[in-house]
Regions:
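Interfacial loop-to-helix junctions that mark the boundaries of transmembrane helices
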Residues: 13-19, 40-50, 82, 115-124, ...
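Transmembrane helical segments that form the transport core of multi-pass membrane transport proteins
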Residues: 243-356
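Alpha-helical transmembrane segments and their helix-start/interface "positive-inside/aromatic belt" motifs
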Residues: 14-22, 46-52, 80-88, 148-153, ...
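Helix-loop-helix junctions within the multi-pass membrane cores of secondary transporters/permeases
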Residues: 78-80, 87-158, 336-417
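Hydrophobic core segments of alpha-helical transmembrane domains in multi-pass membrane transport
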Residues: 24-37, 51-61, 93-100, 130-141, ...
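Transmembrane helix-loop junctions in multi-pass membrane proteins
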Residues: 32-46, 66-74, 100-115, 134-146, ...
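Juxtamembrane and boundary regions of transmembrane helices in multi-pass small-molecule transporters
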Residues: 2-3, 138-153, 168-169, 173, ...
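Intrinsically disordered, low-complexity non-transmembrane regions of multi-pass membrane transporters
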Residues: 1-19, 23, 74-88, 202-213, ...
Length: 516
């Protein structure tokens, strides 16, 4: 165990640098705003800065922990499950995995508290069942080679038809649910399951099908919440703003965070327990991994646990109040339009601080053998999220229905999926679920809510939907990246024979060329 801990220290330093690069730009933007056009109280600023420090350390531990534990656990379980060749077992265990992982997702608890007229447990169980069913569907798609675009066309058509019957106060929250439930606990494990299942297949489309699980699992919650919205006819919507902190000294500042820590210690322990138990059953029955591998996974789980506790405490206690108050101040100015470019700038950098984004970018680079680098993937995600936050701020200021953005956006995304390589489509729809994580829920959503309060808008119809917008735009930007890469490849292939012929002639002696 000591050797494993020592071996992980250089990696921790590497992850710390990555975390600093991700979070410091957001801190810099907020500080510039605070000292220029958007003054905030010292209490909120101090909470934000301490929260940022906790988020940096949290990302450092989580990203290394996910590499050491969540990814290998998911891959081995996915591979072992597929090796059984038992369809009933794959369906049963697949549903159970999806159900348990979703119930344990911390962000789902936040969503449940925000949805009016539906009991929390009813919503949580319904969403978990939706993810479980669609995880099974994702497994079956991979095993039988069903094209992902066909399923996406079918289910998003059903979603938009159901949207016509859902009260407008409920619509944005329903679409937000798809992004929120694929959070930092769900994504690394589900993506690793996909890689494990695809590893058994030896055909040329196996790599293409190793992605797409998160895409389909994001559909389940949207359908579940839309159906619940119709059944419960939810129309009584109330908004409870976050409590703005007031501290007089450093002891009171630490007291705020210390009070939040036990909540997240408990939440993350509850989140990890079902996954650990399922892996324990697999280990006893089939995997039989050696002690060193189990030790590495155990250390990784400890890092994951510490990382998520620190990250969520920093995000909820430090970032959420700052985002809300900043939104109110910016939208309260006579030049409130500035909220749009500032939102785009924050959106560009904030996706880099999403814990699960690191897992996605790394797996994309590995599965594509470097054809899609982690850096290129990060740029595509940042561009997409920047655009989506800008559009979300337009909605806040104008009150335009979210459907005016979602229907054209998804129509275009699904249309280009018919001409883009399958791998890029699967990665793009996975990226949508990954990009809309806890940073979106704890900073961008409060930013929109605060701005909505300042302009006198409807919180439920105008501010909610930020998560849905963030989940939509990467579908377009990542696929466009894939389309450009494909066009470049085709151009290179066409040019290759001419270059090869010229090279062949160049190698011949002059008299040989004359004889030809």
């Amino acid at each position: 165990m000591d050797n494993i801990l020592k071996a992980s220290l250089p990696k921790l330093r590497e992850k710390l640098l990555e975390a600093l690069q991700a979070v410091l730009p957001i801190v810099a933007i907020v500080l510039v705003l605070c000292f220029t056009i958007a003054p905030i109280s010292p209490s909120i600023l101090l909470c934000f800065l301490l929260g940022a420090a906790m988020i940096i350390v949290g990302i450092m531990f989580f990203t290394l922990g996910a590499e050491m534990s969540m990814s290998p656990m998911g891959e081995r379980m996915g591979t072992m499950l597929t090796k059984t060749r038992s369809l009933p077992l794959i369906i049963g265990v697949g549903f159970l995995l999806g159900f348990l992982i979703t119930i344990s997702e911390p962000d789902l608890q936040v969503l449940a508290n925000q949805v009016p007229s539906i009991p929390n447990m009813t919503l949580i169980l319904s969403v978990a069942a939706g993810v479980g069913l669609f995880l099974v569907l994702a497994f079956l798609r991979m095993l039988f080679g069903i094209p992902l675009p066909r399923l996406l066309v079918l289910f998003y058509s059903i979603i938009f038809m159901l949207a016509a019957f859902v009260p407008k106060e409920f619509l944005a929250v329903a679409f937000d649910s798809g992004g929120v439930t694929t959070g930092p606990m769900t994504v690394p494990f589900i993506m690793a399951l996909g890689v494990g299942v695809a590893a058994i297949r030896s055909d040329r489309h196996a790599a293409d099908d190793s992605f797409g699980l998160v895409a389909l699992c994001s559909v389940g919650p949207i359908l579940a919440v839309l159906i619940l919205g119709i059944a419960f006819q939810a129309s009584d919507s109330t908004y409870i703003p976050p409590v703005l902190p007031e501290v007089n000294d450093s002891v009171e500042l630490w007291q705020l965070f210390r009070e939040g820590l036990p909540t997240y210690f408990k939440e993350i322990a509850t989140s990890l327990l079902p996954i650990i138990l399922m892996f324990g059953v697999f280990q006893l029955v089939a995997l039989k991994l050696d002690k060193r591998t189990i030790g590495r996974i155990a250390v990784g789980l400890a890092y994951t646990y510490m990382g998520l506790v620190l990250f969520l405490t920093g995000a909820n206690v430090g970032f959420m109040p700052a985002g809300n108050y900043l939104g109110q101040v910016l939208a309260g100015q006579s030049f409130r339009w500035v909220l749009i470019p500032i939102g785009m700038l924050i959106g560009y950098f904030i996706v880099k601080a999403e814990p699960a984004v690191y897992v996605l970018n790394k797996q994309v680079e590995e599965v594509t053998d470097g054809a899609i680098s982690a850096q290129a993937m990060g740029m595509a995600l940042s561009a997409g999220v920047s655009l989506s936050v800008g559009l979300a701020m337009v909605r806040v200021l104008t009150g335009v229905s979210i459907l005016w953005f979602l229907i054209p956006g998804y129509t275009f995304a699904i249309a280009i999926s018919l001409i883009v390589p399958k791998l890029f489509t699967a990665i793009a729809f996975d990226a949508g679920g990954v990009a809309s994580g806890p940073m979106t829920a704890t900073f961008l959503l409060p930013l929109a809510q605060g701005a909505c309060v300042a302009v006198g808008g409807n919180i439920v119809t105008d501010a909610f939907g930020v998560v849905a917008m963030v989940a939509m735009t990467p579908l377009i930007t990542v696929q466009l990246m894939g389309l450009i890469a494909e066009l470049k490849t085709r151009k290179a292939r066409k040019a290759q024979p001419a270059f090869a012929l010229a090279a062949a002639y160049a190698e011949l002696p002059d008299d040989a060329i004359i004889e030809l």
